[in-house]
Amino acid sequence: MELRLYNTLTRSKDAFRPLDPNLVRLYVCGPTVYDHAHIGNARPVIVFDVLFRLLRRLYGADHVRYVRNITDVDDKINARAAERSISIRELTEETYAWFRDDTAALGCLRPDVEPRATEHILEMQALIERLVASGHAYVAEEHVLFHVPSMPEYGKLSRRPLDEMLNGARVDVAPFKRDPMDFVLWKPSTEGQPGWPSPCGIATPGRPGWHIECSAMSWRHLGETFDIHGGGIDLVFPHHENEIAQSRCAFDSGSMAQVWMHNGFLLVEGEKMSKSLGNFVTIRELLTDWPGEVLRLAMLSTHYRQPINWTRQGIGFAAKTLDKWYRVIGDVEAETGEGNPFESEIADRLGDDLNSPSAITHLHHLADVAEHEDASSALKRRFKSAANLMGLLHETETEWRARQRAAVSVDPDAIAALIADRNAARKARDFATADHIREQLASQGIVLMDNKDGTTSWELTR
């Protein structure tokens, strides 16, 4: 199959050709670890996990290196640690553990490397020294700044007019800047802030600017030029634009990454997510009501480059879909080895710029094929293997049911008692009471199923 990816840099969908097929290199901007990750943070994690899985299938697990950084030096971190009266290290360790657990619950593989910014200060200092030596950066009042006019191609990624870039850069036009667009590579630390020995002969301790961190970590773990750089569309400018400027000028190279991929924004019930609107929701909060696999499928139901409208209806539909798919596979194991046509069909669809909605539509078709009364267990195993490529159906039906029950607050004994009351009401022909009990349970996401043998079973749909 041919992998085609949309490249933000070229504004086109092109065939992917790795620089080195023996080592495909992927870098994705990771979290700033100061608080629980929200559902918008989950989108790039899930999207690029699917890409990681697809690359591993195409080139081999030992021939792909996925790096996702951890930003553990930031003004938000400093403020939150002070607010909670704990050390910065305690805060970042705690928050990273939350993030790691949340993404595992979403079915995401761990990246090969998760570098921390604070462990790469030397690389940042080395890059800054290079940029100053080559005339692309300068020292001013204990700051080091990148001089944007020194790079004629600046703005090629975002393609914004200069005045729009200046408004969107969210930088102070300090009097010591040579140009209003110049951005900080290094800044002085005040008392109580983390600090390190400064580069370029600056006497006072300082700390890195945001953009230099990713340039340094990608260089350290992937080299001067690598294959794919990913992140949310909100990072195109200024973050990724500035990364390109720093890295290209430091190494005098034609590119930093061959392909730049960006996932779209997330809305909640049609509105921008914000605490002021009362619709701000963390991954952890959602995991108290839904299994992570449900959230994953709901996220993948929209193409990654399109805005996604996160709704309870969409989550409910994903839950019902997984209920059906797990009924189809039962407790079979996925088919291993090569030659699975179902998996190849899903890979082909994902190969078209990670077209996950198309892949999910085809999984519905494959589920119908595997559900047919004449379907063999081999078809069910193939169907499960195909879904595995998207990080889905990694459990058996028995495990799924148990996890589904554990994800929400239900009392099986209380449900059994209500079912007994309903059966008694039906036997007494008190259908109004029987219907009321069914509706009461349905409002909690519990669906009753009257079986041919006279028994009643139930399942969660949320």
Curated annotation (Swiss-Prot):
Disulfide bonding pattern of the chain: none
Organism: Azorhizobium caulinodans (strain ATCC 43989 / DSM 5975 / JCM 20966 / LMG 6465 / NBRC 14845 / NCIMB 13405 / ORS 571)
Record bears the keyword Nucleotide-binding: yes
Keyword Cytoplasm: yes
GO MF entry, a single one: zinc ion binding
UniProt keyword terms in alphabetical order: Aminoacyl-tRNA synthetase, ATP-binding, Cytoplasm, Ligase, Metal-binding, Nucleotide-binding, Protein biosynthesis, Zinc
EC number, UniProt record: 6.1.1.16
Positions of short motif 'HIGH' region: 31-41
Catalytic activity from the UniProt record: tRNA(Cys) + L-cysteine + ATP = L-cysteinyl-tRNA(Cys) + AMP + diphosphate
Principal location: cytoplasm
Cofactor binding note of this UniProt entry: Binds 1 zinc ion per subunit.
SMART domains found in the cross-reference section: DALR_2
GO cellular component: cytosol
Needed cofactors: Zn(2+)
List of residues binding Zn(2+): 29, 214, 239, 243
Name of the gene: cysS
Domain of life of the native organism: Bacteria
UniProt motif 'KMSKS' region: location: 272-276
GO biological process: cysteinyl-tRNA aminoacylation
Residue positions binding ATP: 275
Family the entry assigns: Belongs to the class-I aminoacyl-tRNA synthetase family.
Self-association and partners: Monomer.
Localization: Cytoplasm
Protein name: Cysteine--tRNA ligase
